[in-house]
Regions:
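Short helical segment in ABC ATPase nucleotide-binding domains corresponding to the A-loop/adjacent helical element
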Residues: 93-101, 111, 115
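The feature captures the beta-strand-to-loop junction immediately N-terminal to the Walker
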Residues: 33-35
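ABC ATPase NBD coupling module
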Residues: 64-78, 102, 107-108
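Conserved ABC ATPase "signature" region
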Residues: 108-127
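Conserved ABC transporter NBD signature motif
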Residues: 56-64, 73, 113
């Protein structure tokens, strides 16, 4: 669960977020949409502590993110941005498995999870895992970005 409790963010004199409160229950998919400059990216960057709130508290799993080790916090989450951010020199499999591999996750569990995620995003692993991002459509790249975020 992610919870924002009366979060505000100001850059100089520019108030980007004002007294934002919401809860995202575990397992939910959430899309943040809005006009340019309304605070979407700022909100995401506050969740993983790239930006500190001016006021309010943010909790993940009931724990204040300020009390969490920043590296562990960032490694424990993934989110999909508008640009896919896939590594063009890596295959789809390598893109999905990069974070688990860097985190020294069990290789067999990682392979199994990759297959599960390909199913989740509706892409045949036999057809796509050995392809490179440049061989995929924009929508397919976005789905691989979703799979990587959940890896």
């Amino acid at each position: 669960m992610i919870q924002f409790d009366h979060v505000s963010k100001t850059f100089g004199k520019n108030q980007v977020l004002s007294d934002v409160t919401f809860t995202i229950d575990q397992g939910n998919f959430v899309t943040i949409i809005g006009a340019s400059g309304c605070g979407k990216t700022t909100t995401l960057k506050m969740i993983n502590r790239l930006i500190k709130p001016t006021a309010g508290e943010i909790y993940i799993g009931g724990e204040n993110i300020r009390d969490k080790d920043i590296l562990q916090l960032r490694r424990s989450m993934g989110y999909v941005i508008q640009q896919t951010g896939l590594f063009s020199h890596m295959t789809v499999r390598e893109n999905i498995e990069i974070i688990p591999r860097l985190s020294k996750a069990d290789p067999e569990r990682t392979r199994t999870r990759t297959l599960e995620l390909m199913d989740l995003v509706g892409m045949d692993p036999n057809q796509y895992l050995d392809r490179y991002p440049t061989e995929l459509s924009g929508g397919q790249q976005q789905r691989i970005g979703v799979a990587r975020a959940f890896a």
